[in-house]
Amino acid sequence: MFQGLIWVGLALSLLLALDRIFSSDFDDGNLDIILRMEISYDKIYLSKLLSVWITYCLPIVIIVPLISTVFNLTINETIFITVNLFCGSFGMTATAIAINALLMGLKRMIYLKSIIIIPLYIPFMIFGVEQGSWPVLSALSMIAVVIASFATSYGLRLYGE
């Protein structure tokens, strides 16, 4: 039960971040400046991926071992949850960035973005609560990071034109 609560908490924290990933840069014109500086779209994507992951996912990954003592989990269960959360959170963050880049021009459409992204989070959550599924979760995250890189580049290219 604890694993499910943690994964739902991670999904909700990323849904809160969903409207802020590119919107502040988009609203104040910094995204135009960044795109005119001829910085690679992949560098923009990787910087957003790391900044969103450090801001929204890393605190949850750090807090999980502390909270697991409240639920009387063993060391093995705590390590399992932390490793799965670490592996899956990159894929969930990459998915959020890709959806936000593709729907960047839409103002205040957090509900539409949420409806699109929640079904994409379900495989991460299913494999995240299963014990011993970290290799599958890691592969799923790597695939999501690669596909999201292309989707984010496409979304930024559409905006730049």
Model-assigned labels for residue ranges:
Residues F86-I118, R157-E161:
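A structural motif at transmembrane helix-loop-helix junctions in multipass membrane proteins
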Residues S24-S51:
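Helix-loop-helix units of permease transmembrane domains in multi-pass membrane transporters
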Residues I117-I118, W134-A148:
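Small-residue-rich transmembrane alpha-helices that serve as helix-helix interface/gating elements
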Residues M1, P65-F86, G132-V136:
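Membrane-interfacial helix-loop-helix connectors in multipass membrane proteins
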Residues A144-E161:
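Junction motif at the cytosolic side of a transmembrane helix
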Residues Y121-G132:
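Hydrophobic alpha-helical transmembrane segments in multi-pass integral membrane proteins
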Residues L46-F71, G91:
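Hydrophobic alpha-helical transmembrane segments that constitute the membrane-spanning cores
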Residues F2-D19:
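Long, hydrophobic alpha-helical segments
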